[in-house]
Amino acid sequence: MSSPALKLYLCEKDRILFENIKETFASSRIKVVYEDALVLIPSFQVLSPFKVIANLPYNISSPVIISLLTVCHTLPVKMVLMLQKEVAQRLVAESGDSNRGWLTAFLELMSKPKILTYVSKYDFTPVPEVESAVLVIDEIVLPEDLDRKLAVRILKTAFAGKRKKIKNSVFNYFKISAEKADEIATHCKIDLNDRAEDLKKEQWLCLIKYFKDNKII
């Protein structure tokens, strides 16, 4: 923290670690919070840009990322996260990769995630069962007019039927007529026979905006 204006918030749920951290890093510029990250994030409202650096418990890594990008009024400008290797690989999967999930597509709408490095399980004590990776989520910018809650709803629906074609997983699910589906698909340059994993960022943004502007759901 080279600038005196910077402040560091440390969140730890384990009582013993919390006490050790609080004692070790005692400073007016460091605030150590004894809390579950998923409980803290909704109440963590800051007006200035902030960054997140975390070694997350792997069982809550996705919920924490989702919360940071949907609940926070001010988005983090950058996140550096230690994740399970397979989770990190899924979050950077390109369009057309069957490894993509709805969170992959959601991240792509507002950021550029990339794997910085892999971390061997033998670098930890005790040795865990899984390998790890450091994921950098950079260039986080909320696209103009993007309704994040609507985006999550549409993406979750689309990827829930992962092997279904878009015309079934999205348009049929929301009871959109074939004629209207063709109109929307033409407008957003979407092939109705594509699957959710095939759609690119621009197509998702167009689809979400169309649904919002026309109050489809």
Predicted regions mapped to residue ranges:
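Short, locally clustered residues in the helix-turn-helix/winged-helix DNA-binding domain
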Residues: 69, 171, 212
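Alpha-helix boundary/capping detector
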Residues: 78, 94, 117, 180-181, ...
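SAM-dependent transferase fold signal centered on methyltransferase-like domains
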Residues: 184-187, 201-217
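Generic macromolecular interface patches on structured domains
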Residues: 31, 165, 176, 214-217
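An accessory alpha-helical subdomain
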Residues: 133, 137-139, 144-180, 188-191, ...
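Residue-level marker of structural boundaries
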Residues: 26, 96-97, 175, 190, ...
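Catalytic cores of RNA-modifying enzymes
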Residues: 1-153, 157, 217
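Surface-exposed charge patches
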Residues: 23, 168, 183
